[in-house]
Amino acid sequence: MAELVHLQNTSTAEDIIEVLNNDAGVIIDGLIDQKEVNLLNKDLAPYLKNDVFGRDEFTGFKTKRIGALIARSEACRNLALQPLVNEVSEKYLSPFCDGYQLHFTSAVSIGPGESKQILHRDRGIWGGYLPRRIEPLMSTIWAVTEFTKENGATQIVPGSHLWEKDRIPKENEIAFAEMKPGSVLLYTGTVLHGGGANSSKNDIRTGVFLHYALNWLRQEENQYLSCPPDIAKDIPQEVRSLIGYSKGGYILGFYSDPKDKNAVYESVSPENMFKDEVMDRFSTIPNPEELVQKSTK
């Protein structure tokens, strides 16, 4: 059976990326402590107690899923900023962008009797239109409970990011992301993976999914609806920027305030939405020649 590499929580971003380049998946053991895990459980429990089960085999008839974690959970906001994960995301994705964004948030609880999910690549969310050479995602699954093969630990196929798209993995090529609470699985958007079957009698497997994507791609979870301005104004600026209330490149993501009759907030960065003073406009191009040169890779 294939196995995933486990690294210590003292590992560097370079250590992690070296494994990702080979396997496209790696587990960092104990990256957050039990206190942080308890805070996640406390924040998520009121939502996961509801019957929010999947609607098909892919989402799982015995699997609960909730989103909008940035708006709903302070613990998840802190988790989204975890320094080592963000350093890895920035360095791994930097060949394809000038910044990254939070793409998707979800808490997933796989209940007893759930079947295994079909193996898939998360980059498929964009319909297969992205060139294969572009890696669009750095995804994470944080263990809130223990992940075991019996209770539905994520299936992942190490090295499958390098395969031809039609190759089907053999059973002995599939690894299981078995890990303790507070550990995290990092994996790319191109690796084959899927939720595992939960064959236990009463063991529920819960994880927090936080995925980071290139800042020029549309997010899977619409963060501006999941965390609208009236909620975003009360969360830390660093988190707001990560979910998209910021500019990308020179002008991506600008807005004009339709209620502003004096045209003060005209073609400005979303960051201005939460400031009393206009700090940034897109009306001046400091170096047009450089902008033109960078427009084609």
What is the role of each PLM region?
Residues 2-22, 29-119, 123-129:
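Non-heme Fe(II)-dependent double-stranded beta-helix
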Residues 24-25, 182:
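Catalytic palm active-site di-aspartate
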Residues 27, 101-103, 155-156, 186-187:
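A structural signal for short, well-ordered beta-strand segments and their strand-loop junctions
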Residues 108, 146-147, 190-191:
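Short Ser/Thr-interspersed hydrophobic loop/turn segments at strand-loop and sheet-helix junctions
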Residues 113-179, 206, 217-227:
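Catalytic core of non-heme Fe(II) oxygenases with the double-stranded beta-helix
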Residues 167-186, 191, 196-297:
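Conserved double-stranded beta-helix
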